[in-house]
Amino acid sequence: MKVKVLTLLGLAVSLVEGAATRAIDLSDEVQRNVQPKFVQPSFACNVEDGEWADGRWCYRFRITQSWNGSLPQWPSVNLKPSVTDWTPYDRFVVDVFNDSTGGDVLCGFISQPDGRLQNGLNPKSLPLNDYGYSRWVIDLRKWPKETDPKRIGRVHFFFTTPSSADVHLAGFHLLKPGEPLPPVSAKFMEEKVRPAEVRAENLRKERRRQTLERFIGRCRAAGQTGEHAWIGQATSMQKVRPRDDFDVAAASRFSLKLARGEYESLQVLVMPNGHDLANVTVEAKVEGIDPRAIRTSLVGYVKTINPPPYKGAVNVATNLPGGYYRKTQSLPTGWWPDPILDWVGTTDVKGDDLQGFWVRMKCPDDQRAGRYSGTIVVKGEGWQKTFPLSVRIYDFAVPKKSPLPLAITFSPGPHTQFATDEDLALAKKLHADPLSPINAWRKHEMEWGDFLADHYLTMDSLYHGGLKGIHWDVLMRLKKQERLGLFNLGYWTYPADMEPKTLEEWRANVHARFDAPYAKAKELGILDHAYLYGCDEISPKFFPNIAYALDELKKYYPGVPLFTTAYDHDFGTGESKLTKMDWFTPTTVKYAENFAKVAPSRAAGHQVWWYIACGPHAPYANMFVEYTGIEARQLMGAQTVKWRPEGFLYYQISIWNSLRPISGSNPFTDWEPRSWTRYHGDGSWFCCGPDGRPCATIRMENFRDGLEDLAYAQEYERRTGRACEVPVEVCRDINQFSDDPQVYYAWRDGVAEAIEKAAATSCRH
């Protein structure tokens, strides 16, 4: 019998028969009757009988209506345990059967009968798969100090913005140290789990059949015969999964529009029609443009194994302004497009895989504005298909360095924060291995510096300790290239208390860390690019200590901005104690919530940036592997134009847990997409390619494209003297924006047309 056992917080167990205490015994009529039973507008809860994991009874918690923005975000229920003293036990085991499509995440708290629920034990959440069974093993060895494990009175289950979960909870076993897991009913496995697995597989097959039927129908309508292959096309803002659902156009004619110095890309998609395809390539040529300006590469794929602790979003039509609403939905596991294999241009395509090719153009700086014609040729052994390609070059240029100040960490390393024992063992192994990605990149440091600058990034770190943490050679190279952005002199914090000895030690540490990089930056003539970042996400109770640090740092390092993500949402105004802070950085959510305070803060001489990290989740924009490329482009482009942050911060782009860099020509890579905890791509925006060289991703291409769109808006404002507007069709709110590339392009191209029109008007006058 195969049973999925989810082990949380590093507590290893095995499935063998043994005794256990039930915290909630649903076989007891009295205990059944004290459990809540209710029906809400979006969810329902009740005790239910039948054959479950360990007996007749279960507790059913089902979502009856998907969250849509107006329903409760946190449907929840409190179960009442009959056992109140949990101190003898080290594990709590819940058998979970989801009789619905997956993607929702089951969360919980275990707390006392009174007081704040959130002070209870909060185990790692349980992602739900399609129609499946999991055993949720919760570690009870570390209780929060606010919770007395001798007085447990609530076992709280909840979902966040759920879609379709229908969970049957059973077991509720408490295990003492050394006690094995209880057995799982063979009848339950046979009557419930196996049929559910069949339903899940049939659902996947039917979705795939409908996807292929739709795509092939579009190809036929576009005039394709299907001889050898079906050819599709997509923008750079789309993520097209090779073996799962997709929705793309048939290839007919391709186009690119870009300014001088700008990058812009498109995707060509190839699917066999009945027979595997060998040595498939895509070639793009444009008459009158240097062939070296256009490059075709293979789209690579990474495989996610476990559902992530976040949802995605898809826009649905509504009568709201702009005509859309972003609805959250579950994210399937499997193969996702992400790395762009610039060292590979040819591949075999098998079965009904839909293989992507990334066609990227960088417009030469001296290219004449105008319209150009070319072709995209898709070919394999014994066949070839040709499609027209049009290119329009706008009569202006994007800047060499980022149009928005950035503070972003590139410091390759494995995941170690909130790490399990397995994570820490892997980290130790990677650090010791000279061929691991976190070490292999170092011999190509200058190449990485150029590569990052190609994406508007400067090699930097928010958290380094001073002189040795700064890549001085890279910085000076970028200065010479006129591409140098901002860099950090080092991470600072506040004194723990105001005792004289503490303050003396704090000041000594500050001088030891920052005096040398300050002097060197000044000597090299790049001090005007420097900042000092500190007090990462610190709560207000420490603001008096931070205020002291600000006074001292201002004296020691004049001219260097002091920068934080501390939780001052007054941004240095009103009752704020951080009036000496130069740059404040709230999350995108807090920036929008406190937008009325931004202008007063700027009037007082501060800057207000924004940032994302492991949050916010959908419907907000973020950079996870599963999120569409347009989210990164919206965030750095249209949303930045609309909301006007003065900079963007991100904590890390190179958390790499892979054993080896990506190499070879197989698009289905073995790169590990899991980065921070159970997230896919959080803190990890690039991959490491052959021999430690850079490997781009679709996410980072869209990050740069968004900044180039921002440069369009800035050029428009410079030429016209008017603010560049973002219509509601493109972006209505911080969490409501279009996911349609054509809508986005219409706005961006309209800005370009207005720039050229303003230039023509200026010339006439």
Predicted regions and their residues:
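Beta-rich carbohydrate-recognition modules and glycan-binding surfaces
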Residues: 2-6, 19-196
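Hydrophobic h-region of N-terminal signal peptides that target proteins for export
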Residues: 9-19
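Contiguous beta-strand segments within globular domains
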Residues: 86-91, 251-274, 356
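Catalytic domains of carbohydrate-active enzymes that cleave complex glycans
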Residues: 204, 462, 473, 494-499, ...
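Surface-exposed binding patches on compact interaction domains or structured appendages
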Residues: 206-250, 274-359, 367
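Aromatic-lined carbohydrate-binding surfaces of glycoside hydrolases
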Residues: 271, 306, 317, 328-348, ...
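Active-site clefts of carbohydrate-active enzymes
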Residues: 603-634
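Substrate-binding cleft of secreted/luminal carbohydrate-active enzymes
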Residues: 628-676
